């Protein structure tokens, strides 16, 4: 069987997040920053990763991960050699920025802000944060920014989706 790339959730769309981002960049204010953060913590992202072992595909086309499958997330580094996990906002952005090494297949895994918190805020994490669309919008969310966001989340919950309170990572 030929090796193939897996792109999970090709319909993932973060239109509202991108609008909030563009608004924040065009008219920076506490309100536009808050709107962006609120959308970011409720969004799902596509993150490049290598899966070991490679998943099998069922007759129905479903992917089957073996117990103990290891997920190695791809990262980018800045000039100071700090590593940042990658958060693409949609399949189009992920596809145009494929990150494959010789002999390896890079898949795309759905992640959330909470997933990034669990990975990055771990005391032994090699990551300094994550970057949203690193080859276009290039919005860097550092460990320190994540800690500030999380402190504020604990103080207040911001409604999203017509006033319904949702936990970060529950989707748009």
Q: What kind of region is each of these model predictions?
A:
Residues 1-172:
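An interfacial alpha-helical scaffold signature
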């Amino acid at each position: 069987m030929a090796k193939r790339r897996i792109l999970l959730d090709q319909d993932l769309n973060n239109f509202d997040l991108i609008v909030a981002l563009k608004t924040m960049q065009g008219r920076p204010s506490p309100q536009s920053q808050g709107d962006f953060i609120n959308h970011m913590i409720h969004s799902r992202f596509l993150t490049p990763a290598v899966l070991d072992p490679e998943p099998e595909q069922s007759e129905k086309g479903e992917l089957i991960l073996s117990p103990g499958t290891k997920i190695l997330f791809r990262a980018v580094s800045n000039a100071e050699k700090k590593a940042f996990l990658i958060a693409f906002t949609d399949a189009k952005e992920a596809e145009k920025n494929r990150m494959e090494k010789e002999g390896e297949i890079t898949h795309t895994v759905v992640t959330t802000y909470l997933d990034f918190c669990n990975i990055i805020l771990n005391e032994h994490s090699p990551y300094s944060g994550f970057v949203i669309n690193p080859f276009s919008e290039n919005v860097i969310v550092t460990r320190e920014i994540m800690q500030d966001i999380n402190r504020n989340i604990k103080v207040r919950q911001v409604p999203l989706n017509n006033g319904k309170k949702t936990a970060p990572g529950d989707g748009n």
